[in-house]
Regions:
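Histidine phosphotransfer helical core of two-component systems
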Residues: 3-75
Length: 76
């Protein structure tokens, strides 16, 4: 169990930072969208290519599920 818990604890400990950084970056993206609602074509194309709206919605969910997963593993 120690061989599993030790690396999982590293991941779990860093997820709180990843959540905070993600939240901050997504807030910044929202500010850009608010103040620059009509970006250049290159930015529009890139946003469509990476499906930015889905990414903004899904990334926090992914991080949350990773948090739950590491908590469950550490309870084993």
């Amino acid at each position: 169990a120690h061989e599993i818990n030790n690396p999982v604890n590293f991941i779990h400990g860093n997820l709180s930072f990843a959540n905070r950084y993600t939240h901050d970056l997504l807030e910044l993206v929202h500010l850009y969208q608010k103040y620059y609602p009509k970006p250049d074509l290159e930015i529009q194309e890139r946003a469509e290519k990476i499906d930015l709206e889905f990414l903004i919605e899904d990334l926090p969910i992914i991080l949350s599920s990773m948090q739950v997963g590491t908590e469950r593993i550490s309870q084993i």
